[in-house]
From Swiss-Prot:
Entry EC no(s): 6.2.1.26
Entry-linked InterPro entries: AMP-bd_C, AMP-bd_C_sf, AMP-binding_CS, AMP-dep_synth/lig_dom, ANL_N_sf, MenE
Reactions catalysed according to its record: 2-succinylbenzoate + ATP + CoA = 2-succinylbenzoyl-CoA + AMP + diphosphate
Pfam families assigned: AMP-binding, AMP-binding_C
Keyword terms: ATP-binding, Ligase, Menaquinone biosynthesis, Nucleotide-binding
Swiss-Prot/TrEMBL GO biological process terms: fatty acid metabolic process; menaquinone biosynthetic process
Gene that this sequence comes from: menE
Name of the protein described by the UniProt record: 2-succinylbenzoate--CoA ligase
CDD domains: OSB_CoA_lg
One annotated GO molecular function: ATP binding
PANTHER family referenced in this protein's UniProt entry, alphabetically: ACYL-COA SYNTHETASE (PTHR43201), MEDIUM-CHAIN ACYL-COA LIGASE ACSF2, MITOCHONDRIAL (PTHR43201:SF5)
Record function comment: Converts 2-succinylbenzoate (OSB) to 2-succinylbenzoyl-CoA (OSB-CoA).
Record flagged with keyword Protein biosynthesis: no
Similarity field: Belongs to the ATP-dependent AMP-binding enzyme family. MenE subfamily.
Length: 467
């Protein structure tokens, strides 16, 4: 297939590609900057098919580097800038990285690497840029967030990114006014997929270095934004500071990282906020199941239906299985994990769920998070949904605690509001949950451990509290 950026420049050179810190740049301007960077990377020895790690931020330079590495045909290992030096070191070694490119403010996180400052001082050398891409080639590698066990390197091909973008546009549509606000990390699939969609669709990315709800609200009210990707915690922060709807041009608020609560859904409906819930993974190159706004209140808790042409089914043990061209070919240098993740061509998500009579998917739990108490299956998310309805709770996570009598019992960790009253919460639980599902212990914490994408890391809670 033709090189996406080069093709986009030929199609719409003067259209806006990137808006960062108020400055607009066209696809033509971005392409020229990318070529210059590619020449510098080439001069530093980076070649086609080499594994190159990128440790950056949500900024213009990192944005350009992602494109530059693709132009050279290198495979980009995206490093999470929130990781420790030790965690990063594991990924670099496991991926057998040839080069590391690192933002100046993050150089202490790696033993050695090419800093952005070094790049700026490097002389240009005419690079060998790829005019076409083999869709089966690896474009990127992202290590799983480690919600269970050691992180694994997820290989994402150009075909994976292409079909993810195609599936999304077939579902959400495309207009001349479209633009995508990216306040999620571009080292994560939710952010990188926005960049890929920008080039394939020919729409601008409004890139934000951090999620600032005040600034994001201003952008959503400006008329410049049509789509934004958020996780639940981001959405709740937006709803808290803004009591109305947004500009009519905002047509999609794409929610990932778990379904919204009934309270959030009702607020969005009252305020005419077009919330689109979705389910996706690093292994599926972003969303692969989506629930449109019209079904949100009728299908509370559902992630929706599989996007075209993906398929979803439920295994005999309740595990969600997926099939489609956006799904990873496997894990880097990990044949055992790859083989264990596929059965008859279907990808095993590790999530438990079900399909209702109309084919809507409901994700219940990670298999590893399931609590089995006295032979009863307890799904932490069910308890969390009940607890989160209480206005005194900001955030909640439920895990299983070993118990001599029952094997395991649920316990809750809560980030509380000032109005929190445990007695009131227990009454709510007793009214809405079977006795064995009621948390046997409630612990108030300042914050919950999360991945870069905003998913709560229950395994970290278990480690911290020796459960």
């Amino acid at each position: 297939m033709t090189n996406w950026l080069q093709k986009r420049v030929r199609l719409s050179p003067k259209e806006t590609a990137l808006v960062f810190e108020g400055k607009e740049e066209t696809f033509e301007e971005i392409s020229e900057a990318v070529k210059q960077l590619a020449g510098k990377l080439f001069a530093l020895g980076i070649r086609k098919d080499e594994m190159v790690a990128l440790l950056g931020k949500n900024d213009r330079m990192t944005f350009l580097l992602i494109h530059a590495l693709q132009q050279l045909g290198a495979v980009t290992l995206f490093l999470n800038n929130r990781l420790t030096k030790k965690e990063i070191s594991f990924q670099l070694a496991n991926a057998e990285v040839k080069h590391v490119i690192v933002a100046d403010s993050l150089v202490d996180k790696v033993a050695t690497g090419i800093s952005y400052a070094t790049l700026a001082e490097t002389d240009y050398e005419a690079p060998a840029l790829l005019e076409t891409w083999d869709l089966s080639r690896a474009a990127s590698v992202m290590y799983t967030s480690g919600t269970t066990g050691k992180p694994k390197g997820v290989v994402q091909t150009y075909e994976n990114h292409w079909w993810s973008a195609v599936a999304s546009v077939l579902n959400l549509g495309l207009t001349e006014k479209d633009s995508w606000l990216c306040a999620v990390p571009i080292f994560h699939i939710s952010g990188l997929s926005i960049m890929m969609r920008s080039v394939i669709y020919g729409i601008p990315v409004y890139l934000e270095e951090h999620f600032d709800e005040e600034k994001i609200t201003q952008l959503l009210e400006s008329g410049k934004i049509s789509t934004i990707s958020v996780v639940t915690s981001m959405l709740e922060r937006l709803l808290k500071i803004h009591s109305g709807s947004y500009h009519p041009n905002v047509r999609t608020v794409l929610l990932g990282g778990g379904p919204a609560s009934k309270a959030v859904l009702e607020i969005c409906k009252q305020r005419d906020i077009p919330l689109v819930q979705s389910f996706g993974m690093t292994e599926t190159a972003s969303q692969i199941v989506t629930l449109p706004p019209k079904d949100a209140l009728n299908k509370i808790g559902s992630s929706g239906k599989a996007l075209f042409p993906a398929e979803v089914k439920i295994a005999d043990d309740g595990e969600i299985l997926l099939k489609g061209p956006s799904i990873t070919p496997g894990y880097l240098h990990n044949k055992k994990a790859t083989e264990a993740s596929f059965v008859d061509g279907w990808f095993k998500t590790g999530d438990i769920g079900y399909l209702d009579e109309e084919g809507f998917l409901f994700v219940l739990e990670r298999r590893s998070d399931l609590i089995i108490s006295g032979g009863e299956n307890i799904y932490p998310t069910e308890i969390e949904h009940v607890i989160s309805e209480y206005e005194g709770v900001k955030e909640v996570a439920v895990i299983g605690k070993p118990d001599d009598k029952w094997g395991s019992v649920p316990v809750a960790f809560i980030v509380a509001e000032e109005t929190f009253d445990e007695a009131e919460l227990r009454l709510i639980c007793e009214t809405n949950l079977a006795g064995y599902k009621i948390p046997k212990q409630i612990t108030i914490v300042e914050k919950l451990p999360k991945t870069a994408s905003g998913k709560i890391q229950r395994n970290k809670l278990k480690e911290r509290h020796s459960m």
